[in-house]
Amino acid sequence: MTPFQAVCTALASTVGTGNIAGVAGAIAIGGAGAVFWMWVSALLGMCTKFSEVTLAVHYREKNAEGDYVGGPMYYIKNGLGKKWYWMASVYAILGSLTVLGTGNATQVNTITTSIDSALISYNVIDDAQISMVNLVIGIVIAALVAVVLLGGVKRIGTVTEKLVPFMAVFYIILAIGVVVLNADKVPHVFEMIFVGAFNPSAFTGGVVGSMFMTMRRGVSRGIFSNEAGIGTGSIAHACADTDEPVKQGMFGIFEVFADTIVICTLTALVILCGGEGIQYGVAAGAELTISGFVTTYGSWVTIFTAIAMCCFAFSCLLYTSPSPRDRSL
């Protein structure tokens, strides 16, 4: 695949649930100050992501079909030597187990939650029908993912090349609209973020009283979103048709910036500027982000937020679901 397709495929794995439900969860449990620590983790994560991607391209191999394959398991094996083969195997096994939860279950949950919210807001379904609707959604998702994955890594790259830029621009426009329409609240929101990072109880009524909790939530959600330090993003970059590892590593830096500094920040502003009263200390997900859009635009926007969130989550599913033809841990 081309370097741009590799970037889009890697972004597909990072621009997903973490940008929507993850940010909402961080703010609900850690307060607005969690956003500050998310930024800090992103700045450090840019360095980590650059190293991961550069190493992945440098130590990659060609498979039986002549395509490039790489990632942490390859640069551990080829970079550290035979005595560290066991570590490469451990990473591959743990990585396979991880995608079952963070890569698949959470993404499908976001898709069903967003579609359910849209259908309920238009009175298409009621609470009693949600289980059946979710079953149908699950079957449709499985079929769509299978169609793409059976085409191998090239088809994944082709789909994400078209889907990722569209969904990112679409979501950014919606989010910027919320910020513009609530411009008078922006200064106070940034005050909440910076002051709350070191004194979270100042804006949460004492519910969130530990700076450590705020820091932990912000850093963990930031890593969950941009995957810097996890290594999985480098697997897609290793497939890029390039002979310049360092140049591809720079794309890794851009990836973290776009994911966390831009999209996660906009999500936080949507929640803090346009959202309803936040119940601090109570776990929250995509519904908190949706409320930010609905409060500003009205219930009609739920159909558009559902489309955006489905695109985010579906693209992430494509990346984290291994292709039977080209990708394997």
Region spans (language model):
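Membrane-interface "cap" regions at the ends of multi-pass membrane proteins
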Residues: M1-I20, E65, D241-D243
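Helix-loop-helix module between adjacent transmembrane segments
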Residues: L11-T14, S41-G66, M73, K77-N109, ...
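Helix-loop junctions at the membrane interface of multi-pass solute transporters
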Residues: T14, A24-G30, A56-K62, V148, ...
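Conserved small/polar residues in nucleotide/adenosyl-binding loops
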Residues: Y319-D326
